[in-house]
Structures are given as structure tokens and as C-alpha cells.
Amino acid sequence: MDKLLERFLNYVSLDTQSKAGVRQVPSTEGQWKLLHLLKEQLEEMGLINVTLSEKGTLMATLPANVPGDIPAIGFISHVDTSPDCSGKNVNPQIVENYRGGDIALGVGDEVLSPVMFPVLHQLLGQTLITTDGKTLLGADDKAGIAEIMTALAVLQQKNIPHGDIRVAFTPDEEVGKGAKHFDVDAFDARWAYTVDGGGVGELEFENFNAASVNIKIVGNNVHPGTAKGVMVNALSLAARIHAEVPADESPEMTEGYEGFYHLASMKGTVERADMHYIIRDFDRKQFEARKRKMMEIAKKVGKGLHPDCYIELVIEDSYYNMREKVAEHPHILDIAQQAMRDCGIEPQLKPIRGGTDGAQLSFMGLPCPNLFTGGYNYHGKHEFVTLEGMEKAVRVIVRIAELTAKQN
């Protein structure tokens, strides 16, 4: 464990923020820098079959150290950080033996407060790694990377019995592209775990069904003084569309297994307006109903418009709930839960109100639930991780490898 913190601080020093709307994968040069660093480290550790694809997927194998027909299992994390907040010049603060109260983030007015983030009350006495209030931290998912790399070192150094262990580090997870170029056949694992979760004990095998909705509204602009019966205000149509979307089914009004409609962006003029929604729901039927609802709203608002004015709606599915795939292989969850209990951790099975690479991989033939990293408040300047949580994640990864070998 001695190098766990060192690894993490090294990885977050690299700016690997991904970028939406870019065709190339990885979408940013910084991701390549981390991928090449990890490739070098994996080779130095003596792993075999170390490959880095042209689309930025890094794979490697820690060979089995015991005989027998032991299934190969995998551990996966992503190298990019969220586009929602800067990942440049990350300056972590290490708060040892947290005693409660507000933590000043850097020299400004930003604080990490238990009033806003009550989970801090549960972390007294632990070592917290925070931001300086200017960037995100990058624990999502560089904590996962550091934990996988450290677990590999522990398996080697302590000669713990294990089968073949596959590891992979992917790009552009935050913009939904990483898993699309993942070669499941080349990875050659029976199942895998993404290490991309949150607080200690979290084990996730349910995620949202997800879709994006892009709405293009074309109006007609004339001088306001002579506009009666002629002007068609695209912004007014956009407002009418949003007024039809259920207000109590938005992200800020929902939790747990509740789905939502989220207006992520809206821009425009009288002549032209564009709206971007995301739709999320755990239930597949409700997910389809939400998509139909958006189509009905667009049709209703667009009824009777002049032929040169129109509303165009495009819906694209992003990913689906992996529960239906992971549930076919209950032993994957059983092993993870047993590993946590063996490490003194009570498993917390909870839904992911989001998505992971594992969701897409599960539908590509690689069942892939999600393990905790020990991090909190991802995608923003209040992000932090506990060193103790990271250490527990390492122990769980090692124990999963050990249990898989023992059960076969």
C-alpha cells in the first residue's frame, strides 16, 4: 500500500479532461500521456500482453500463479476526467486525521463543509485528499486506476493465489465513447469489475437506461413592429416545449430509482433555437414511455406551424441498464460481496444514477458491475477521496482475485 497515495497524486497531476463533440478517440492529448505512462508501469511490473490500441484502450495480463481451470477476471478504470470542471493544474490538499468542521479549499472562499456534504461526519479521523477549490480532483477515476495498479503490486509481492487477471484502462468514459472501442474478445475475461464507484462498500449492478434528445426549432423572424400573424418565435416554442415536460421529474426533484427529464442546454434566437435533453430511467418500459412523451410534446407544440417553420426532434439511445445482463451471472456479485465482508466492509447494493463503461460492456458480452473507489462529489471542485477508502478498495480487489481462485 506504500505507493498507493504516490500513484494517485502522480496520475491526477496529468490533465486528462475529455471533450464532448470530438470525433477522435481519445478526445484529448492528455489522455494519451497517462495511457503511455500506465503502459510503461505495467511493463515494468512484468505484466504480459500489454497492448495499447489506436483508440486508446490499454490492456494487460497478470498471469495466474496457481494451476487449474480458473476463470480469467478483469478490472477496468477510465483515464479521462469530466468535461464539467477543469482538470488542469490539479493541486491536491492532504488533510490528515480529519477532526470535523469545514475544510478550506485553497486560499479563496471555497470550503468543503459537512453542512452541505453530511458524509464528512462519517469520516472523522481519516485522511482526506481534496482539491484547492479551483479544479476537480480526478478521483473519478484515477483513484480506481491507482487502486488497480496497487492491487496488482500486492498480488505479486505477497504471492497471493490468483488466476489470470486482466486489467484495462479506457479513454473518454465521461463522454460515452470509451467502451465503444473496447475489444471484448481481446480482453478475454469471463467477467470484470469497473472500479469507478463512490463511497466504501458501494457495489452497483443497476444503472439508468439513457437517451439524448436533440430538438431543432426553426422559426420566422421579422421586425417586431410588423410581426402580427407573421413572426414565429423559436424561443417561445422552446419555452412551450419545456413547459410541457413534467417539472417534478427533473434531476433536482428525483432520487433512488426515480427517472427524469433533464434540459441540459438551450440556446437560440427568434429564428432558430436548439434544446438538448437527456432522459434517464431504470425501468425499460418507463424509459420508452419518456421518449414517446418527448415526441408527443414536440408534435403538440409544432402543430399548425407555417410549412417553413418546424420542430425537428432526434432521439438517440446512449446505454441501457446492465441489471438484465449481470443478473444472469449472480456469482459475480456473490464473490464481490463476500470479498467486502472478508475485508470488514458491509456491501451496499445501490443503483447508479448514471452510467459506467461496465453498462456498455455488459451488453457486449462482458458482465461488469461496479466497485467503490472511496471517492465523493465527483465532477466538481468539492470532489475528495479518503486514503482509507482507497486502501479498502485495494484489499477488495485482491480478495476478489483470491476468492475466484479458491472457488475453482
UniProtKB/Swiss-Prot annotation:
GO terms for biological process: peptide catabolic process; proteolysis. InterPro entries: ArgE/DapE_CS, Bact_exopeptidase_dim_dom, Peptidase_M20, Peptidase_M20_dimer, Peptidase_M20B. It comes from Escherichia fergusonii (strain ATCC 35469 / DSM 13698 / CCUG 18766 / IAM 14443 / JCM 21226 / LMG 7866 / NBRC 102419 / NCTC 12128 / CDC 0568-73). SUPFAM superfamilies: Bacterial exopeptidase dimerisation domain (SSF55031), Zn-dependent exopeptidases (SSF53187). One of its GO terms (cellular component) is cytosol. Zn(2+) 2 binds at residues 140, 174, 379. Its main location: cytoplasm. This is Peptidase T. NCBIfam families: peptidase-T, PRK05469.1, PRK13381.1.
